[in-house]
């Protein structure tokens, strides 16, 4: 079997002993949602998948059957056959809504703190270690976001950009941390029920492209500043969405504004920090 790529090593790593078929379904579905596996991409052969996941053939076939029933993959026969990704997983709107309602503002802020710490180190290493061919790829991924037309494909394009940027830093641990953080919040960021001023793909794309330019020009201070501002806006958006969902039955659907003109997210973070 060929040596797996870094992405394959993350997606197809060994599974826990319990509910292995369900774990495979979840792992592959999340990889597609994060953009690690793209629509049209062929999965490794079943024998290789079984070996990488550390499962028997029957368990793997059960998982692939479930993914086919969900319309996420299809298996084609013939010389050029195999199992191919054909669709994004269906959005788990109820689960995302419950995440907003059950996650406190302090917890969302803490996610932002962790992401800021990881991203600050990652972007500085990217300025040092990224290679020339990385920049064209990152620009292509940045532009893919504004071309995406659904919340699911926007979340996928967004996370794939940030993960590829982390990969360019050539630190597997930091790249894995970025994958984990993207998995935790990116679908909520682009959720279809977000606040009235929906998260803007054009603005996010512009920020991504500006970040690529800073890395390409080896400007670590500027790149870090842009990264932290980007994460801060993301966290404020998540908090705004939480507040809107939490107050939906008693307040207007548009996000509240504090007396000084700041967003409801800023006001809530200040209040919780006191």
Curated annotation (Swiss-Prot):
Native organism taxonomy: Bacteria, Bacillati, Actinomycetota, Actinomycetes, Mycobacteriales
Ranges for domain HTH gntR-type: 18-88
GO molecular function: DNA binding; DNA-binding transcription factor activity
DNA-binding region(s), chain positions: 46-65
Disordered: annotated span: 250-274
Start-end of Polar residues biased regions: 250-265
Entry keyword Transcription regulation: yes
Protein name as annotated: Putative HTH-type transcriptional regulator RmpR
Keywords for the protein's UniProt record, in alphabetical order: DNA-binding, Transcription, Transcription regulation
Domain of life, per lineage: Bacteria
This protein's record includes keyword Transcription regulation: yes
PROSITE patterns xrefs: HTH_GNTR
Gene3D superfamilies documented for this protein: GntR ligand-binding domain-like, Winged helix-like DNA-binding domain superfamily/Winged helix DNA-binding domain
Function statement: May regulate the transcription of the rmpAB operon.
Signal peptide: none
């Amino acid at each position: 079997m060929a040596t797996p790529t870094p992405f394959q090593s993350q997606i197809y790593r060994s599974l826990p002993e319990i509910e292995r078929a369900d774990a495979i379904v979840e792992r592959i579905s999340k990889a597609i949602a994060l953009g690690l596996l793209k629509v049209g991409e062929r999965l490794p052969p079943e024998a290789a998948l079984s070996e990488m996941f550390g499962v028997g053939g029957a368990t793997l076939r059960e998982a692939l059957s479930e993914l086919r029933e969900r319309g996420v993959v299809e298996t084609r026969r013939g010389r050029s056959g195999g199992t191919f990704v054909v669709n994004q997983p269906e959005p788990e709107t109820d689960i995302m809504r419950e995440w907003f309602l059950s996650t406190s503002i302090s917890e969302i802020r803490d996610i932002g703190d962790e992401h800021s710490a990881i991203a600050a180190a990652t972007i500085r290493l990217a300025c040092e270690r990224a290679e020339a061919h990385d920049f064209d790829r990152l620009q292509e991924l940045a532009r893919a976001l504004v071309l995406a037309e659904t919340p699911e494909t926007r979340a996928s394009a967004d996370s794939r950009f940030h993960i590829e940027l982390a990969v360019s830093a050539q630190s597997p641990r930091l790249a894995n941390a970025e994958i984990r953080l993207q998995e935790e919040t990116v679908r909520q960021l682009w959720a279809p029920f977000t606040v009235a001023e929906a998260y803007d793909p054009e603005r996010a794309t512009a920020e991504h492209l500006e970040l690529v330019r800073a890395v390409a020009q080896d400007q670590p201070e500027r790149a870090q500043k842009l990264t932290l501002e980007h994460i801060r806006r993301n966290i404020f958006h998540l908090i705004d969405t939480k507040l809107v969902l939490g107050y939906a039955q008693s307040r207007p659907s548009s996000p509240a504004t504090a007396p000084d003109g700041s967003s409801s997210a800023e006001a809530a973070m200040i209040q919780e920090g006191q």
